[in-house]
Amino acid sequence: MDNRPIGFLDSGVGGLTVVRELMRQLPHEEVIYIGDSARAPYGPRPAEQIRDYTWQLVNFLLTKDVKMIVIACNTATAVVWEEIKEKLDIPVLGVILPGASAAIKSTHSGKIGVIGTPMTVTSDIYRKKIEALSPEMEVSSLACPKFVPLVESNELTSSVTKKVVYETLLPLAGKVDTLVLGCTHYPLLRSIIQNVMGPDVKLIDSGAECVRDISVLLNYFEINRSREEQTLRHRFYTTASAKSFAEIAEHWLGQKVSVEHIDL
């Protein structure tokens, strides 16, 4: 047993989609979350800058004595997950491999779409992971640079958002039967994305898939939180407005949250 919290990091609010799934599947675990909304989105930034920013978030979480770190950001996972995993002596999870595996299990046609930030798409990491597991798959990737700013602005259902999503995803419509939401912000736009892609296209939430791996590692390392320890104190930190973060977090998680602004 290990009653320390699990640390989550993201470029902003997107990683809350992973936290929500964790709270559903593993409700007895405690969360510490840091979202770098002041510097979001990470996707258009150079790899070295993404690496530096991600390490800042990791080091912040380490000061909170977390027992595991979840890089709840596809861009950061693509750039620096391997390095962080090798250097830390606690488990470190990324969100890409779970999403890739789930897409392979889901598809019937072998035609998989991947949407993500420019960095995630340019890295080609989803195609590499999918084809390594199942070489016969046909992967089509599409960068969606406007999606993260819309989510960070809490523009989740506006007419502008619907128009942007429609125009962006049109090249993939009718060409895939499975679509990986290769950015943890994108599930916040899930209903609009589903409407554009059509009801027969299966959407894969890479972050939600990651929670299954969290559960496996908690059991493997025997670091589950004691179920007798009832007091949970989830803590959320943001580099931008605590008020704006709380509005999105409370809407998405369905509960009041404690949010503190920090400067890195």
Curated annotation (Swiss-Prot):
Catalyzed reaction equations: L-glutamate = D-glutamate
SUPFAM superfamilies: Aspartate/glutamate racemase
Any Pfam family: Asp_Glu_race
Active site per UniProt: 73, 183
Positions annotated to bind substrate: 10-11, 42-43, 74-75, 184-185
InterPro entries hit by this protein: Asp/Glu/hydantoin_racemase, Asp/Glu_race, Asp/Glu_racemase_AS_1, Asp/Glu_racemase_AS_2, Glu_race
Keywords of the record: Cell shape, Cell wall biogenesis/degradation, Isomerase, Peptidoglycan synthesis
Pathway(s) this gene product operates in, as recorded in its UniProt entry: Cell wall biogenesis; peptidoglycan biosynthesis
UniProt function note: Provides the (R)-glutamate required for cell wall biosynthesis.
Protein name per the record: Glutamate racemase
Source organism: Streptococcus gordonii (strain Challis / ATCC 35105 / BCRC 15272 / CH1 / DL1 / V288)
